[in-house]
């Protein structure tokens, strides 16, 4: 007959195995397909857009180094930019869906915001990785001839989650 401690140990081990298996299945259950879809879509946007990417940590480092750059928030003013944005960012809203053509007025306003120096470091972001606004902004900066364009895919969500400071419009 098995000792009580041996039975309890076996029950504990079986519970642990079932728990780990269940947790693994819960993490695996279809979520990776969503992650893959986001990653593939992002990679294709970067390829089509012709821009580079920058991580949250890299952007924070550039800001801390006081690197000369223009940071553009492409989110709506009232719903997002006014409430929180990366320090020093200026706002220029782009739609979520890819924009094949900009009207002349929007194109001129965006080019004016970006300035005459086509070699200037420009970082463009939106709310989060799946948001297409930053893709549109970065893609159009490249189409307008700017050569040092970065998309910050994590956007304000990643910035805030990293506990980095944000600015608000008063």
Where are these regions (language model features)?
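Catalytic cysteine-centered active loop of the rhodanese-like fold, especially the PTP/DSP P-loop
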Residues: 105-153, 157-159
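N-terminal secretory signal peptides that target proteins for export/translocation
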Residues: 1-4
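Active-site neighborhoods of enzymes that stabilize oxyanions during catalysis
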Residues: 163-170
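Sec/Tat-exported extracytoplasmic proteins
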Residues: 63-67, 78, 93, 114, ...
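Mid-length scaffold segments of soluble, non-membrane domains
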Residues: 74-105, 121
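Flexible, polar/low-complexity N-terminal or interdomain linker segments that lie immediately upstream
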Residues: 6-71, 75-83, 170
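Second-shell loop/turn segments in exported
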Residues: 43-50, 94-100, 125-129
